[in-house]
Amino acid sequence: VSIRDLIKSAMRMRPDRIIVGEVRGVESVDMIQAMSSGHDGSISTGHSGSPEEMLSRLETMVLMGTDIPLMAIRKQIASAIDIIVQLERLRDKSRRVTEITEVVGYEDGEIRLNPLFIFKEVAEDKVENVVREEGCYEKIEDEVSGRLIYSGNRLIHRKKLEAAALQLEGGL
């Protein structure tokens, strides 16, 4: 049984959302269609170096499974995906969220993005003794220190959150 078959079977069950562990190929066509057909809150993962690269990979995977023109694929991706959460494995082998980006829409032949949060590393000389929940009071050697910084960009598509009765805090 392929992932494509599983996504199609899940669609027949009329779920509220669909979660696919990872898209690697033509099953991305079905995942995008599921996300575009009223399954808000659906989630999937993929591997790339940045949100822009993920969109490019997704376009390529969809092209492998269909004969749809690139413009139509980009429009469908832009309407299906709301947020991209980028994780990276850092030099200390930890995995961190390094970017949270809103997919704004399709304009001038491209999918437009709105970066909301970006991981900023703290310089080594600015990190002294770090308090950890476990009780360690000194910095672990070679550990990457940093945090997600709000970009200052406001979330553009707020109506979906409001429709779900969710409130945003602060200036986002």
Locate predicted features:
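Nucleotide-state-sensitive switch-loop elements of NTP-binding domains
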Residues: 1-9
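Intrinsic disorder/low-structure terminal segments
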Residues: 6, 18, 116-118
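NTP-binding/hydrolysis catalytic cores, primarily Walker-type P-loop NTPases
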Residues: 93, 99-172
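Conserved P-loop NTPase nucleotide-binding/switch module
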Residues: 10-108
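General structural signal for secondary-structure boundaries
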Residues: 2, 69-70, 167
